[in-house]
Structures are given as structure tokens and as C-alpha cells.
Amino acid sequence: MKKLITTSALLILFFNLSVFAASNSSSKTKGWWNVPYPGTFDTSQLVNEQAFIRVKGNKLVDEKGTTFIFRGVNIADPDKLRTENQWSLSLFEELKDWGANVVRLPIHPISWQKNGKEEYFKIIDQAVIWANSLDMYLIIDWHSIGYLPDELFQHPMYDTTKKETFAFWKDVSFRYAGVATIAVYELFNEPTDQGGRAGKANWHDWKTINEQLIDVIYAHDKNVIPLIAGFNWAYDLRPIKQHPVARKGIAYAVHPYPQKAKPKVKSKQNFFDLWESVWGFAAKDYPVIATELGWVSADGLGAHIPVINDGSYGPQIMEFMQERNISWVVWAFDPLWSPTMIKDWNFTPTEQGSFFKKQLQQHK
């Protein structure tokens, strides 16, 4: 008898759960025929008519054909900043005061998934409005680390899929088509196979997937600059010597942190020679944007490979990039994400923050 009652109870529970699941699924699709199509960004909210930045040969130029160099900073993921009550116009005003003409938004897949695209678009919309009001540009960065063709990634915060990545750029390029403030789409932050731990990187596959992403973007908007990274965590561009990405209007990204180059003798010329051979050469034929760079002392906050340096890196990398018209965006304007540019939310500069602030203000 006891067994019969237990079995009956289980059957009732299973029935109730099945009904709940069916009704819950129904609530998600109820009235699906009335769900509107996605909308584009309302440009009437913008106060400045900014020039589109375009690719001309190996340079970035404005609409008058004048060479344009992006000089700016990375902020933390906007969702992180919003959660910490630091997402505001005043943050962008501080960046403008430092001399930045561009802000990179590192959008992590986990952050995008947590919010959903409609909610995250509200955050990006705010960035567009604030940046436009201050005549600054934006780089939208799909901030994943790993090897997308194999869908293997360095940490759960970077986990994504090919489908999600394509959908992200499809939706972003549709929403912000024709918005000059968003100048650059960085297709994938740092491709790496982690020494084979995330599969085996193959340039042909990586080249193909980037070309397909660019085709999706260009189908919606041809007024943006697709930015493509090389292997070794966005450091090695040597494969493009023989097999460049076969699309027009593109630029290449590099993250030349100090410990990436490892000369036997640490002289300026030896660093220059190594940088030139691995990524600097690309600036002869294409625009190059160093979308992450920076350093921290060995005993500094968050010191880790490959960003540790005694400070000699700063002047050297700036000289190298200036000689080649390479744009640059420092990591990171946040007191926690190392190498940090600020010590606190009073915007007290760190060692590298002080150095790069002087560099930025030379071009205000």
C-alpha cells in the first residue's frame, strides 16, 4: 500500500511539473506574432555630427582625407561599471579631460548573456550618446579569449559560440548602422589556442571566419572598420604576409604587452626589431590599432605575465608606434583591472596612468 501511494504521488508530481513546463514555455512564445522586429539606434539623440573614420591605404583618415590616429583608453565592461555605480557621463568627461579621442568597450560574452541584447543595447546607447556629446569615438570589442573555431575558451567569462558571435555582430551592425561615433568593430578580442589546450589554431580557418563576420557586418553597414586580431593573444600578425584577410576597409589589432617580445639583450633596438618582425610590419600596408597595451611593476597591483615591466616599455612602445602611425588604446581605466591606469575612482593616476595621460594630453 505504501509503495502504491508513493508511486501515485510521483505520477502526480511528474504531471504537475509537465504542465508547469508546458505553460512556462507557452508564456515565452505566447503572442510571438506580435513581437516587433529589432529597431535601429535613434540618431536624433546625438548632438554632434561626427566625421566617419575610414581606411585609406595603410592609414585611417577622416572625411577630408586627413590622417587620423585613435588615442584613448579601455574601460572595464560597461555592465561591471554599471553594477559598481561608475557608469556615467562624468566618467566619459574624465576620459575626455585626460585627452582620449576613443574609448574601447570590452563586452564580455558572459555579460552579454546575463543582460540579454535588448538590455545591453541600452547600455551601449548611453555610451554612444555620451561619447558623441564629447566628440569621442567608440570601439566595440567582443571580449572573448580562446579559439572560436573550436569553441574552446580561456575562462567561463569568455565562453561563446560561433552562432552567438555571428548573431552579436549581426545585431550590433544593424542597430548602429550609419552611427559615426562607433568607428571600429573589434571582431574577437584575443584569439589563442593556449598552446594547443584550446585546439590547434589554423590561420585558414581563422581568416575564413573573420571574412564571414565582415560580410555580415558589411551587409548592414559599410561605414565601420572591422578590426582583426592575430594569434598568440592578439600579438602575431605574421600569417597576413602570405594570407591577408581578403576584405577591403579593414584594420589589424595588436596587443603588444611588454613581455611578449623576449630579446636576449633588452635594448630598445632589439625590442623594435622583434616588434617589427611579428606585427609592426603590417603598418606598411594596413592600419594597425594597438587596442591593448600597458605595464605594471613587478610588485604592482595585479602584476602578471605578460604586463610586468620597469617602465622602460612606455617610451619605447610610443616611439615605435608614432613612427608607423599606429593608433593605441591603453588598458585599463579601472582601479581593479590590471594593468590599471587609476588607483581609485577619484582618478588618481598609477605609474602607467601618469605616463599615458601625458601622452594623451599632448594631442588635445
Each language-model region and where it sits:
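Bacterial N-terminal signal peptides
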Residues: 8-18
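Extracellular glycoside hydrolase catalytic/binding regions
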Residues: 52, 84, 156, 166-184, ...
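N-terminal carbohydrate-binding accessory modules
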Residues: 21-102, 358-360
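Acidic/histidine-rich helix-loop elements
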Residues: 64, 68-89, 112-116, 153-157, ...
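Feature marks short, surface-exposed loop/turn motifs that line or immediately flank catalytic pockets
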Residues: 77-79, 109-113, 146-148, 191, ...
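An active-site-proximal structural segment forming one wall of the substrate-binding cleft
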Residues: 83-102, 106-107, 113-144, 150-187, ...
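Positively charged n-region of N-terminal signal peptides that target proteins for export
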Residues: 1-4
